[in-house]
């Protein structure tokens, strides 16, 4: 073997070692993880767990002359199979309802000789917070089913990891009345401040439909966390027409998680809250 041949052979071997070393450092793909979880002796449910951990956020959109539909939820929800299944079913239910209403209204418009405007439902779930026990989601929904303008509404969901079940924030409290009593003062004063910030004079006439502060329990409650461990933040979303005319729009009122509020939390959930005082 000549010196040139020996040198070329050494270079080839070294490049092969480097290539193997580089391959060894590459992280396994989702498919490889799922395959590893499926081998004999792997823990039961390993394949499903591996697939769930690699689940992507869901975002379904549809737009045509009849409807505009969108429904999305984050990766954290997609990673919980039972929760994702419920969200997928909710999406299908809302889409079917939108299409049924749109077809009915389109037929009625054509019969009466009026133009039809596509109906819509646009809903995006977003993560509010994630603690060891709860995944908290919020949604702002834009919808249109005819008329002068569309509507804004809100939704809320909690996933209880300990019980593997879906909950509403008010499920964590002893009653809606107790929740209202613990939040009324801060909630109502928050509404007044929010209206003042918009330059709106707060109506106080007894005969005004918007003079009375509504019960917080009748609105949409979002529970959050500042540290990823405890529920210690709360926002109450108010849709248009609830406390003012449509032109005022919606409101989002931050209400502190006080000791008084935590005192009306059910015993099962008290350890998951952290009051500010």
Regions found by a protein language model. Name each.
Residues 16-17, 206:
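Residue-level signal for mature regions of secreted extracellular proteins and peptides
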Residues 24-277:
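Compositionally biased intrinsically disordered regions enriched in Thr/Gly
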């Amino acid at each position: 073997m000549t010196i040139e041949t020996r040198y070329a052979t050494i270079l080839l071997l070294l490049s092969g070692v480097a290539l193997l070393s580089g391959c060894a450092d590459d992280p396994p793909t989702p498919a490889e993880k799922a395959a590893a979880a499926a081998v004999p002796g792997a823990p039961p449910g390993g394949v499903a767990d591996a697939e769930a951990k690699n689940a992507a956020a869901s975002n379904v959109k549809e737009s045509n002359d009849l409807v505009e539909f969108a429904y999305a939820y984050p990766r954290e929800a997609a990673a919980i199979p039972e929760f994702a299944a419920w969200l997928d079913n909710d999406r299908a239910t809302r889409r079917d309802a939108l299409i049924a209403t749109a077809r009915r209204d389109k037929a009625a418009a054509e019969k009466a000789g009026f133009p039809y405007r596509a109906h819509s439902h646009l809903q995006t779930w977003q993560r509010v917070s994630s603690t060891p026990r709860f995944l908290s989601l919020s949604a702002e929904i834009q919808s249109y089913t005819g008329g002068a303008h569309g509507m804004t509404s809100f939704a809320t969901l909690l996933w209880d990891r300990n019980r593997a079940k879906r909950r509403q924030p008010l499920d964590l409290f002893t009653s809606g009345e107790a929740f209202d009593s613990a939040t009324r003062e801060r909630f109502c004063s928050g509404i007044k401040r929010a209206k003042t910030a918009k330059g709106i004079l707060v109506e106080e006439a007894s005969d005004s439909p918007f003079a009375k502060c509504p019960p917080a329990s009748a609105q949409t409650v979002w529970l959050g966390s500042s540290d990823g461990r405890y529920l210690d933040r709360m926002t109450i979303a108010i849709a248009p027409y609830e406390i003012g005319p449509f032109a005022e729009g919606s409101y989002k009122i931050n209400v502190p998680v006080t000791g008084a509020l935590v005192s009306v939390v059910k015993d099962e959930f008290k350890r998951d809250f952290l009051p500010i005082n």
